Structures are given as structure tokens and as C-alpha cells.
């Protein structure tokens, strides 16, 4: 998604972008298109039962916007705090010598491979379906449009290789994926986008994710 940094003319904004076509109280957006019939259509496509992990591993050097961090810590019981200490050893607590490991994460949740809730972006002070920020933001989250309000996603997926259709291994910084780009990339596949489909775009930037440290963290996080 491109975020336009230039001033937006008032006439560029459709005045009736809310209420949603799915209803004034809707919090799921286009996921409403994943009907039971759509799920059945999707599962009938399965032939080999292969499972592909689309997520990147979270670690402290992952590409991120400035100010966002991910840290993971492991702590053990007090006998094992410092394994190089002269008193460190395998002895635990009690007659069965119990030891343990505790994991602690300190992170900005808007990082890595994830699915945004519809409360993430706003136009001015209004979110999806026209909800006002002042009405939904509370001390510990939002009372509407959180990721918990979205249904589970089981549907047909389409991978659109826009990097290849642009003639390269990855898009250039600043490239915007347009409808025409998507149509061009789809033309050679014989597929079209149907209501309820999950559309994934291959931009090529994921190939730089594992650089340690990332060569261009800002652009990798952006694209």
C-alpha cells in the first residue's frame, strides 16, 4: 500500500465511503465475502495437501520502521542465571531437581508478517465504516475493529507476481502496484480475482529480509 504524502484534494475522497455495504455496524470488511460456499470452493481445490509457511521469523534484526523493536529474552531459575558463574550447575529445586526456562518478549506488535486489524489506519479521525477514533479508542485497545473481530480465513489464494511482470526480481523503491499491474500479471496465468479471494503480491523485497543486518531496513519494511 502506498501512503500518499502530498496534500489530498477534498474531491479525491468519496463522501459516502461509510457506512459499509456490509452494514453500519460491520467490523469485518471484505472478509464478509468468505461465505460457507466460498470455503467449500476453496477446499475443493486441494490436490496434494501441502502446507506453505508464509511468515518470516521474528528476531531482533528484522526490518522495521524507526522506533519499532523486537526483543526476546530467556530466563532460567536462580540456579542458572549465569551459566559461567562458578556456582552454576544442573541442580534444581526439590527432590526431583526441577529447573525451568521462561521466555519474555518485548516488541512493537505492528512488525513482521502479520494481518492488520481494521483499526490500524484511519482517514483523519475516522476508521473503517466511519467509526470515530474518540468513540472506539480506550486505555488498553479499541472496543471495535480489533483483529479479534475478524473471522477466520479459509479461501482461495492468488499469488500475483508483479516483480516478474515489471521485468525484474523485485520492484524499485517507490513503485506503486496499480490495478493495471495486477491485471497484467494475472493475464498470463488464466486466473481472475473473484469475491472472497485472498490476493498475495510478490514484490521481491522479501528476498532481502534475512540480510544481517538488513541492508536497507526502511525500504524492506516499507515494501
Regions found by a protein language model. Name each.
Residues 1-223:
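Active-/binding-site microenvironments in catalytic and ligand-binding cores
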